[in-house]
Each structure stands twice: as structure tokens, then as C-alpha cells.
Amino acid sequence: MSSTPVIGRIPVRDVRPAVDSGRRPAKAIVGETFEVTATVFREGHDAVAANVVLTDPEGRHGPWTPMRELSPGSDRWGAEVTPDVEGRWTYRVEAWSDPVGTWRRVARIKVPAGLDTGLVLEEGAELYTRAAAGVPEGPQHAVLLAAAMTLADDSLPVATRLAAALTPDVDAVLARH
């Protein structure tokens, strides 16, 4: 058996802050905001997303803080976090495949070019419907369902259908859930 660490389909590497390659704790004071960064990538062209998960001194997980790509195409992600009580905090970076992010990137390219428009919009409607299922009933749930219904509505112009899926309201719901 090898003692080489297993790297999954979405590696998370070079997580910082780290002192002495993670052998010693990084330090901050209560209320001090600091940035956690990591290299997050995957093979192929599918999008990824990542969160920083803080664990407080009592062992409670959260809050989950969404990370953002620091420089497009760099695979370097970051998020600012703030410990709110004294004690030994830990953090980890979680990463996953982002099918909605992948669809949004592809749709922004293919739909204006007239490539596979019907299929792309149908896939988007299905993805947004699935995403809505993970959002509690209420206004945010309704935002995603409305976007899904508009994407699926063949009676509307293609540009209108796509635009409904890319609004700031939809962005906000997707970022939160």
C-alpha cells in the first residue's frame, strides 16, 4: 500500500493561510478578517465552486462562506472569513462540480452564436428546476422557478429566455444556495 494521499476529481491544493506547511496554526484575533485561498481545479471544461467552512472552538461548523475565483482562469479561489469568539478555530475548503455554472458559461457562448439553442435552453430549464428544489419555498424558490419556466417557454425569443436565467436576482439566489 502506498502512503501517497489520494486526490479526488476536484483537487484542493495549496490552502492558505498556513504556517510551516500547516504544522502550526495560523493566528488571528477576534473580529479580524482574513482571506483563505486555495487552488481548486478539475480536468476538462466543467466549472467548479468552493466554500470555506469554519469550525469554531466548540466544534460547530459554519458559516459556510462561498469562495470566488480570484483571477479568472487562474484556478486560485479565495474568501474572507472572520472569527467572532476567542479560541482555536479550524477551517477547510470544500469544492465540487458546478453544473449550473458550467451551463451558464456554455449558454453565454452558444445561444448568441445560435448553436444548439433549443437543447441548451432545455438543459438550463432542467438545471434551474433541480436547483429550485434545493431552495426553501418562498421568494428565492420562486425566482429560480420563474427562470426555469422562462427558459422552457418556446413562445418567447431566445434572447429573452436566456436573459431570464442570468439576472442579478437569479445570481443572488444561486450564490446563496
Where in this protein do the model-derived segments appear?
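Non-catalytic, glycine-rich low-complexity segments
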Residues: 1-43, 106-135
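Basic K/R-rich, polyanion-interacting modules in nucleoproteins and related proteins
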Residues: 30-34, 170-177
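Extended acidic/polar, glycine-enriched regions
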Residues: 66-123, 127-174
